[in-house]
């Protein structure tokens, strides 16, 4: 490193004086985050490791107040980790809904970490979209991924990664009263949501269990490696309909809730929107899903040439699953054409006129939600194995949504659906 590079510092954007003692990790640790990770991380313990002088930095705390108070961007934790790992160029990646705060966060990190920030503006639909590959190609040595859980383990990424869940404070009292008003005392409710509302789900669980006025059993389901009470649009727990009276999703929109409804069509589903505080009964047309997806599989059975798509949006694609499917498709006598796409659109696939059917290893919801819009069958890995008679057929009572389960297709494995009770 030249003398000029050492002396070059980002322009300061906040008024105040920084202490030299805050510029680096006092322990001088050079542990690489991507090479070693403890099996379980105690969040409270991690917070306690942040130096008190950083937590009490008046200038930093004043800058943090520029961000909405009900959104926890964990700025202290981020600054501490960037300093600890002596990162020089840091990529920050967040969903479009949070990009409005990206420049404020960028300014804060540049000033208090003395590093360069690169804002990644491409779409980030979920945790599967973490784009450490692109960040590394931009010479970044650290990436902060916002608003999604640790779906992609930090010990396999190409650069150091910090996941910030961006937990959101909501009116928990209103949520509790809403559930008490709408469900009989003693009801067994599977409550889940996106990672932003996970603390609220666990907090209300204890309060409702201890309520003498109107006790409810809140059961945050878990499909590993997701956290208890967490659900994704492609991954949710298969629940026992004899043990659960209802499902309640905390969050806006239906995308993630639909995963649980598809996986558990016989359990009533409800949604609590924490932004407008509305509580609604939600339904999903499972019969239509079965008809549309079964039709796509039937059409694909006669295919001779199959386009096998590897999703290249972040880490959506899985090479092991692609290779496994390629082997099986070739063994069935089909010609396989491998295609790499960051995003999959009907117009794009229509250009491959001589391909009879497509199999996409990216996001199963592309096929489930939008498969009808493609002029050729677009199958998921699971549906492809059904077509090849290597997996059980779905029906109106069961369609698996376990893509990122520890043994799921999203992890390069082949799940066993034979032991699922219907």
From Swiss-Prot:
Pathway: Protein modification; peptidyl-diphthamide biosynthesis
Reactions this protein catalyses: L-histidyl-[translation elongation factor 2] + S-adenosyl-L-methionine = 2-[(3S)-amino-3-carboxypropyl]-L-histidyl-[translation elongation factor 2] + S-methyl-5'-thioadenosine + H(+)
Cofactor annotation: [4Fe-4S] cluster
Any one GO BP annotation for this protein: protein histidyl modification to diphthamide
Note describing how the cofactor binds: Binds 1 [4Fe-4S] cluster per subunit. The cluster is coordinated with 3 cysteines and an exchangeable S-adenosyl-L-methionine.
Positions with a binding annotation for [4Fe-4S] cluster: 128, 234, 363
EC numbers for this chain: 2.5.1.108
Compartment(s) where it occurs, according to its Swiss-Prot or TrEMBL record: Cytoplasm
Gene3D superfamilies in the cross-refs: Diphthamide synthesis DPH1/DPH2 domain 1, Diphthamide synthesis DPH1/DPH2 domain 2, Diphthamide synthesis DPH1/DPH2 domain 3
One GO MF term: 4 iron, 4 sulfur cluster binding
Source organism, top-level taxon: Eukaryota
Keywords: Cytoplasm, Iron, Iron-sulfur, Metal-binding, S-adenosyl-L-methionine, Transferase
Matching InterPro entries: DPH1/DPH2 (IPR016435), DPH1/DPH2_1 (IPR042263), DPH1/DPH2_2 (IPR042264), DPH1/DPH2_3 (IPR042265), DPH1/DPH2_euk_archaea (IPR035435)
Iron-sulfur found in the keyword field: yes
Recorded GO CC terms: 2-(3-amino-3-carboxypropyl)histidine synthase complex; cytoplasm
Membership in a protein family: Belongs to the DPH1/DPH2 family. DPH1 subfamily.
Subunit structure: Component of the 2-(3-amino-3-carboxypropyl)histidine synthase complex composed of DPH1, DPH2, DPH3 and a NADH-dependent reductase, predominantly CBR1.
General function of this protein: Catalyzes the first step of diphthamide biosynthesis, a post-translational modification of histidine which occurs in elongation factor 2. DPH1 and DPH2 transfer a 3-amino-3-carboxypropyl (ACP) group from S-adenosyl-L-methionine (SAM) to a histidine residue, the reaction is assisted by a reduction system comprising DPH3 and a NADH-dependent reductase, predominantly CBR1.
Name recorded for this polypeptide: 2-(3-amino-3-carboxypropyl)histidine synthase subunit 1
Organism: Kluyveromyces lactis (strain ATCC 8585 / CBS 2359 / DSM 70799 / NBRC 1267 / NRRL Y-1140 / WM37)
